[in-house]
Amino acid sequence: MTALRLLADTFFLTKACRYMDLQPQLILELATLGICTGFLAGLLGIGGGMVMVPFLTFMLSLRGVDPDLTVKMAIATSMATIIFTSISSVRAHHKRGAVRWDLVKGLAPGIVLGSMIGSMGVFAWLKGSYLAIFFGLFVGFSATQMFLDKKPAPSRQVPGTAGLMGAGSAIGFLSGLVGAGGGFISVPFMAWCNVAIHNAVATSAALGFPIAVANVLGYVVSGMSVEGLPADAFGFIWVPALVVIAACSVFTAPLGAKAAHMLPVKKLKRIFGSVLYVLAIYMFYKGIMH
């Protein structure tokens, strides 16, 4: 069954790439990015967005896209791929019984609300350079929290309905501004509430789906009236990148999810923090230079 699926996806990917007239080098670059981000999505529960946004920003810049639009397109495209990687990785986590579905149900309504406000309002209004700086600063802060490894008070528990609604709104809103699956906020939040890190990562992967769907709708609607976008864009989404990355990442996301359950907690947190630090520095630099 897996072989048939791989064959079908390869056929679809080949046809799609020919239709979009993609250069072999670009296909290879996007495929490599998809393989890496898919693995990270499963491993860290971050949807791969923290890695994808900086690289897509760089690739779009090389293609001569308006500097103010490169970051927005990278963020929107990254979020669109999370629809596929979240499904793939959460299945692997669910088989291990690691997903806290009670938290998913509690956070999802707020996530949808926050995502729509962010992607349809603030995202379209902010300049790309401001988004890049915000991305760098916030991700750097999240990385610092992971390295500090502060122990939450033993008595602290997951908040009630209103608290989860508020937390979900913040996760959805901020995720929409940086194109990530919410793991950079939801994982530290759940750890702060004494949820085990492996459960937090698995639950974050499940939250990636409602985050991605709500934000993608907003990116498409808000981007339809924007001038200067490439012909192969759908709203703010760069369609060729979405097709190639999604087709490749769905195979490596389960591998990352498997690795997440084999690594010790401290090492997992350090991997998470290290990835975020490197990419935060790049995006902060990108925002300052433009």
Task: Provide a role label for each language-model segment.
Residues 3-44, 51, 57-72, 86-171, ...:
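Juxtamembrane transmembrane-helix boundary motif
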Residues 41-50, 175-183:
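Short helix-coil transition sites and intra-membrane helix breaks within transmembrane domains
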Residues 158, 177, 183, 209-213:
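Accessory recognition modules or surfaces
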